[in-house]
């Protein structure tokens, strides 16, 4: 029972966390470029 619910929880979680990490790393990269 629990295993069938895991994908429906993990997919949105990964879908929200991965873009958040990507945007954060991109923001840090841009900030470093402006400093240099």
From Swiss-Prot:
Keyword rRNA-binding set for record: no
Keyword Nucleotidyltransferase: no
Positions of transmembrane segments: 9-29
Keyword entries, A-Z: Chloroplast, Membrane, Photosynthesis, Photosystem I, Plastid, Thylakoid, Transmembrane, Transmembrane helix
One GO CC annotation: photosystem I
Major location category of this protein: plastid
UniProt subcellular location: Plastid, Chloroplast thylakoid membrane
Topology class, membrane: Single-pass membrane protein
GO biological process per UniProt: photosynthesis
Function: May help in the organization of the PsaL subunit.
HAMAP family, per the entry: PSI_PsaI
Record family assignment: Belongs to the PsaI family.
Protein name per its UniProtKB record: Photosystem I reaction center subunit VIII
């Amino acid at each position: 029972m629990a295993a069938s619910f895991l994908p429906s929880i993990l997919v949105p979680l990964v879908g929200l966390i991965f873009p958040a990490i990507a945007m954060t790393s991109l923001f840090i990269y841009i900030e470093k470029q402006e400093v240099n």
